Amino acid sequence: MLEEKLERSVEQSAAALTAMADDFFDHPEVGLQEFHAFETLTGWLEKEGFTVERGIAGMDTAFRAVWKHGEGGPNIGLLCEYDALAGLGHACGHHMQGPAILGAAKALKDAAIDAPYTITVYGTPAEESISGKVVMLENGCTFEELDVALMMHGGPATQVDVKSLALNKLKIIYHGVCSHAALKPEKGRSALDGLIMACQGVEFLREHVPSDVRMHYTIVNCGGTAANVVPGYAEASMYVRSYNRTELDGVVARVRKVLQGAAMMTETEVEIIEEKSLDNKIPVLALNELVMEQAEKVHAPCIRPARQKTGSTDFGNVMRHVPGTCIRVAFVPEGAAAHSQEYLDAGKTEAAHNAVVYGAKILALTGAQLIEDPEKLEAIKKEFHENLAKELNSQS
């Protein structure tokens, strides 16, 4: 039976896959510096017979690996991340993704399913820092040759996301005029005053935005340490989020007016630099249901309904081009937060090793279902295009 064959393949690779995950955990690499993980993953895929392209989309640690069985048929995309957090190591579980994806890719390759199909593995670096998938898209890697894009991520429960928050990251700089705060205060124009008033304006704005909107900021440069100098420079970083891109664009426009108004009131100048823009996911319920069915088949731990409260991800931008989903597999206690000591402490546990194996099995079984059942795949693609059209129409 095909399902048993796929699971057996993953189990036979389990020791190598979990050892690889432990190795990545012990050698954490931040975004764009993931050279060890990159070489390990691409080398393994090459040995398995995949055609590997390194350094794609203008990113040294991005890759594409392709294996074809016959001509035509669906192209199953498997995407992985492998960057760590600066100062925290693999406290988000990215060390498990690559090994799980390789396990699924090898199982699907070795299965030699009767129908023609292609397996494409994408290595997508720097998710935590510069949202590498966005950079890849901007550099011409659209992922549109894929019929579906699948990911795995560790978490406190085995579940999928129904949605994600669209995000705009703003770098905000106020320029003022320095002056002696006691001798010539009238000559000064405080950049810090402008920034403080902007932050106060954002606080008042909270009352007048939809309930799902999140606005958070930090002052990264307060303009100096001498109280007797009117600050000529002040800088902040701000995230604005919403579950709907159209809604978010409207809120960001209002935030910009607040920032400009604060500059006007303090006779300072403001620079507003958009550093990052992430789209919300386009959910495909049929694909989510299919993935969760496979999770139940392999008896994955702590199976729960889809997450309703989520963060932001560059996978949302990919999901504007191709139907996709990410299965989260339990390896930390329920209630544990990502980017935490709990995630770090669990990184090399038996639960983490099991999550790699479960993730590989779930994605392998999902891929096989889509290869063997073209009607199921077409229904997923149809739902995706309908949901995408609704989203885009709401923006017009």
Which residues make up each language-model segment?
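Non-cysteine beta-strand/loop elements that form the S-adenosyl-L-methionine
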Residues: 77-79, 175, 326-332
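General beta-strand structural signal in soluble alpha/beta enzymes
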Residues: 53-56, 121-123, 150-152, 304, ...
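Metal-dependent amide/peptide-bond hydrolase catalytic core
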Residues: 196-396
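Acidic/His- and Gly-rich active-site-bordering loop/insert found
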Residues: 2-118
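General structural feature for long, well-ordered alpha-helical segments within catalytic domains
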Residues: 2, 13-20, 33, 37-44, ...
